[in-house]
Each structure stands twice: as structure tokens, then as C-alpha cells.
Amino acid sequence: MKSPEAVWDFWSHSPESLHQVTILMSDRGIPLSFRHMHGFGSHTFKWVNAAGEVFFVKYHFKTNQGIKNLESQLAEEIAGKNPDFHIEDLHNAIENQEFPSWTLSVQIIPYADALTMKETLFDVTKTVSQKEYPLIEVGTMTLNRNPENYFAEVEQVTFSPGNFVPGIEASPDKLLQGRLFAYGDAHRHRVGANSHQLPINQAKAPVNNYQKDGNMRFNNGNSEINYEPNSYTETPKEDPTAKISSFEVEGNVGNYSYNQDHFTQANALYNLLPSEEKENLINNIAASLGQVKNQEIIARQIDLFTRVNPEYGARVAQAIKQQA
């Protein structure tokens, strides 16, 4: 059973969740459709140029259809009548040649800046100021056809943040580093060890490696050897240009607690919301938090909202009191 008690108990002990909880409980938490929502890489990635210079990068996909959201009451009604509403909307738009698109932009942070930034660049609960590091437009992603075979092209797809091309690398973000392994591991369990050979997942360029055998293998490299190092010249060799860049490490290794400012960015978001969206935010929080029976949890969460913005906390407290 889903438990508001457990959800808010966890959040009230995790102030780093405040920014995301504010997004989730606002109108932004329920997009009108997949076409009307932004997308983000969330993690920080690393770019390395031909000269070996390192930059940190954040990816942003901004919808070209504009942001549109649903109020919770209407969303509940739609979910009851058609739980596949979002999938149908996307399918029908593409079928009608109203191809949805997103502008891909990046924020680029020089390596030296990352060493002195006030907010840690590798905390997925924080954003990077677009005033200090403005978005640089890269291109456009357009969805221009629907899957012809849903199983082959959707259910068997294996996206992974660990699929890099030379010049793009993982950052020290610990959550990202965990995902680098977890996604591939899940794919091997779900689709198989040779899922990368399926048409939807296979590379567009020639692949040279020593992988052989395994379940569902259909291109096994004939009698080629499957080990390295070896004495043969015509076998795949490591590309020195694709090696991971070096980086500096200093200090003592250990597990450290850190006191981050979890309130400033949540306050900026709260102040950005129009009055109607603030009202929806307060009502959505009160409807959920008001179900909690443990008053200590409610008090602890309201205290966090108050530390974000006194008005925020006061309005949530008043809304819960009115519905009691």
C-alpha cells in the first residue's frame, strides 16, 4: 500500500528534496502531455576536447510546443477514463505529422570554476545558474515517426547513461556512477547479454571487440579469438584517443556529511510561480500531507517549507488546518 506517512516521513528528513518536491506538487508535476514538458540530463557530464581540456556540462531539452500542465482534479479525471492519455496524445500528434520537437542546449562550466562553485556541481538535487552559465543551443530533437513494432522498437530498447562517445565522460557524480553500471546490468537481465546486437540498439558504426557467445547471439565472429592481450595483428586494438581523461585528486578519502543550502533554490522557484500556481501548489501539498497522522512529521515538513519561505510554510499549515 502506498503510504503518505512514509513519503512525507522520508521527505521531512531529507531537506535536499525541497526543490524537487516543490516542482512535483506544483502544476509542473503533471504535464498536459509528453509534448509539453522539458527534459534534462539531471547529472553533470564531462566534455574533453582534442587539447585535453576538461569542461563540465549540463544537458537541457526545452520543448518547442510550450509548457502546458494539468491541475490535479482534471488529471485524476483523465487518469480514470484513459490511463494511456499521454501515450495516445504523442502517437496521434506524430501520426498527424504534428512532429514534436525539443531544442537541445548545454551549460558549459570550465573545470577551474567547478573547484570554487558555491553549490556542488555533482549534486543532482541542485541546478546550475543559467545567468552565470547561459544555455548554448546545440540542435533540435524531433520525433518524426511512430514505432512500427512496439515490442521490437520500444520494449527491447536499452538506453543507458553509460553509452559514451569519445570526448564525453562521466563526472564524479556518485549517483551517475552508480547508474553507469545499474542500467547495463538491468538490460542484461531484461533483454539479454547481446541486446546491443538488436537493430534498435546496435551501433551505426562498425563495432570491433572480443565479445562472443551468450544467449541469443546471432553474429558470433566466426573463429575469431575472444581474449586480449594476444599475439595477432589483425585483431581489435584499443584506440588511444578514446581513453578516459586524467583528473586531479586531493584530500582524504572518506564519507563526509556536508551542510548544503537546500532552501535558496526552492525559494527562488516558489517566488517564480504565479499566484494561481502557488495556490495549486499549496492545495496539492495539503491534500497529501494532510493525510499523515503523525503530527511530528507534519510539523517537521512545515518547518522545512517555512525555512524555504515563511509564506510557503504558513500557507501549507493554514490549508491543512482548514481541511481538518
Task: For each feature predicted by the language model, list its residue ranges.
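Active-site-adjacent core segments of small-molecule enzymes
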Residues: 1-324
